[in-house]
């Protein structure tokens, strides 16, 4: 599945038939997908940013490679096989000198054994949309709602010691709330949500 957005494709359309994630891609300044070339793929820029990141973070005391922890259910061979594919993708994409995926396991409860203890570097999760509106997705990442499951349960940004990260989440939350307040013009609502979503993706 080719996807440059956080909101799923095919969920929302503007009055002229434009699919919502196309608005997000436009806000990100990405060209239209031609069915072959990944629009965010820029190997030269990646190598430049990688070298810059290694230099800056090494000066801050970070050692490389960085190890990203990913958890699967113990005894679930399908999950382990998928994780190994992901590990290889990390290796092929980042290089083993930059970011390495470490696969770990939990026994019975990923929430109790991993998420609540903040042991994960990232998590792969998702669900089918409950209703056809960007709030269904973006509302999960705001910093001002107990209903923001992914922010509260997985992201933990509100608990971060980084003022910069907290400020970015506050800006994102403000954009989402402004979009959610538009109820009399659905095209304007979707445009505002696309702005918020692009902001989130630009700062991921």
What are these regions (language model features)?
Residues 84-92, 108-121:
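Short helices/loops that flank or line small-molecule/ion binding pockets
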Residues 64-67, 95-99, 118-122:
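Loop/turn elements at helix/coil->beta-strand transitions in domains of secreted/extracellular proteins
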Residues 1-92:
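Append "and occasionally in soluble cytosolic enzymes with long acidic Gly/Pro-rich linkers
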Residues 71-75, 104-106, 125-128:
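Active-site-proximal beta-strand/loop segments in catalytic clefts of secreted hydrolases
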């Amino acid at each position: 599945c080719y996807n440059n957005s956080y909101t799923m494709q095919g969920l929302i359309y503007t009055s002229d038939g434009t699919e919502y994630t196309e608005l997000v891609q436009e806000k990100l300044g990405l060209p239209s997908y031609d069915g072959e070339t990944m629009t965010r793929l820029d190997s030269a820029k990646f190598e430049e940013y990688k070298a810059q990141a290694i230099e800056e973070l090494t000066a801050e005391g970070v050692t490389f490679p960085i190890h990203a922890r990913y958890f699967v259910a113990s005894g679930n061979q399908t999950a382990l096989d998928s994780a190994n594919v992901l590990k290889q993708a990390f290796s092929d994409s980042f290089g083993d000198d930059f970011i390495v995926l470490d696969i770990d396991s939990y026994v019975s409860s990923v929430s109790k054994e991993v998420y609540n203890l903040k042991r994960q570097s990232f998590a792969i999760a998702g669900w089918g949309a409950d209703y056809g509106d960007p709030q269904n997705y973006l509302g999960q990442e705001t910093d001002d709602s107990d209903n923001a499951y992914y922010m509260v349960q997985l992201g933990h940004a509100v608990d971060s010691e980084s003022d910069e990260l907290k400020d970015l989440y506050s800006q994102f939350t403000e954009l989402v709330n402004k979009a959610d307040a538009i109820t009399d013009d659905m095209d304007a609502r979707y445009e505002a949500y696309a702005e918020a979503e692009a902001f989130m993706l630009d700062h991921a």
